Amino acid sequence: MVEQIKDKLGRPIRDLRLSVTDRCNFRCDYCMPKEVFGDDFVFLPKNELLTFDEMARIAKVYAELGVKKIRITGGEPLMRRDLDVLIAKLNQIDGIEDIGLTTNGLLLKKHGQKLYDAGLRRINVSLDAIDDTLFQSINNRNIKATTILEQIDYATSIGLNVKVNVVIQKGINDDQIIPMLEYFKDKHIEIRFIEFMDVGNDNGWDFSKVVTKDEMLTMIEQHFEIDPVEPKYFGEVAKYYRHKDNGVQFGLITSVSQSFCSTCTRARLSSDGKFYGCLFATADGFNVKAFIRSGVTDEELKEQFKALWQIRDDRYSDERTAQTVANRQRKKINMNYIGG
């Protein structure tokens, strides 16, 4: 029987974000800048990562508490060896209705078919520019946008449902909004533009670098005829619109200008096995990995997860001001540990 639990602000638990690795083959400035994550950076050793059996056990217990959706994140999750084994395990859990994966897309041709065969049907590909030169300057690994576009074409050809995520930074890639909308509209692929967020400690975020949803919408309406789309479910993070001529949808994620804390239903497990109730968490998370490895039963694990959720009161984006950003900037968990 599924228990219905809510946090201190009355929010149910519906989603679990599982970070499977802290490693990535890109060095995007807003997530893992090369100046910090250089060639000598020490990533987590394998024994510090949760095993797939541990992740599946955690997911099963969370399903009994109301989780219906699981998203696999990183780092770059396709760098975790044998990820299809985890997908297959998660697909066998009663109550889990949807498994998604967020990736930079570079390794889709290498691993996509195995993941599809294991039961993965839905992926989000992070792609912050369609211009090759600009994209290379963003990822700092000399990877061309055309390379990722080819990987996306491959993913759709094997049956994966693909959405594209774009983090927009003022003066960096805001000129990519219109060409990317045009490209993916013609491909009938949903694209979502995300306001630049102050996740982690190393991305140099401030308000002046944010292109708000209203600014994006004004730009878009000068080039396309669109209609708004009603939200599909409680907790949907994107504001969706539909192109009038062919019905393809796109989304704007208002993580800064119009926060969605009040409907956030996500629990997050970092790559080092810690629970966090918020993407912008500052305190050190509860060490689920150590708790599991201490020999607890599933019932004890469930009671701990219940307690963690019931004391949750995170609403950082609701409270974000220049001062709170300054006060918390050096204390947040980095994005490569917790995913997006």
From Swiss-Prot:
Pathway: Cofactor biosynthesis; molybdopterin biosynthesis. The keyword Nucleotide-binding applies. Its cofactor is [4Fe-4S] cluster. PROSITE patterns: MOAA_NIFB_PQQE, RADICAL_SAM. The keyword Glycoprotein does not apply. Residues 8-227 form the Radical SAM core domain. GTP binds at R17, R71, T102, K163, R266, A267, R268. HAMAP family: MoaA_B. It catalyses: GTP + AH2 + S-adenosyl-L-methionine = (8S)-3',8-cyclo-7,8-dihydroguanosine 5'-triphosphate + 5'-deoxyadenosine + L-methionine + A + H(+). NCBIfam families: moaA. This is GTP 3',8-cyclase. [4Fe-4S] cluster 1 binds at C24, C28, C31. Pfam families: Mob_synth_C, Radical_SAM. Belongs to the radical SAM superfamily. MoaA family. Keywords: 4Fe-4S, GTP-binding, Iron, Iron-sulfur, Lyase, Metal-binding, Molybdenum cofactor biosynthesis, Nucleotide-binding, S-adenosyl-L-methionine. S-adenosyl-L-methionine binds at Y30, G75, S126, M197. Coiled coil: none annotated. GO terms for biological process: Mo-molybdopterin cofactor biosynthetic process. One of its GO terms (molecular function) is 4 iron, 4 sulfur cluster binding. SUPFAM superfamilies: Radical SAM enzymes (SSF102114). It comes from Staphylococcus aureus (strain MRSA252). It comes from the Bacteria. Binds 2 [4Fe-4S] clusters. Binds 1 [4Fe-4S] cluster coordinated with 3 cysteines and an exchangeable S-adenosyl-L-methionine and 1 [4Fe-4S] cluster coordinated with 3 cysteines and the GTP-derived substrate. Catalyzes the cyclization of GTP to (8S)-3',8-cyclo-7,8-dihydroguanosine 5'-triphosphate. CDD domains: Radical_SAM, Twitch_MoaA. Monomer and homodimer.
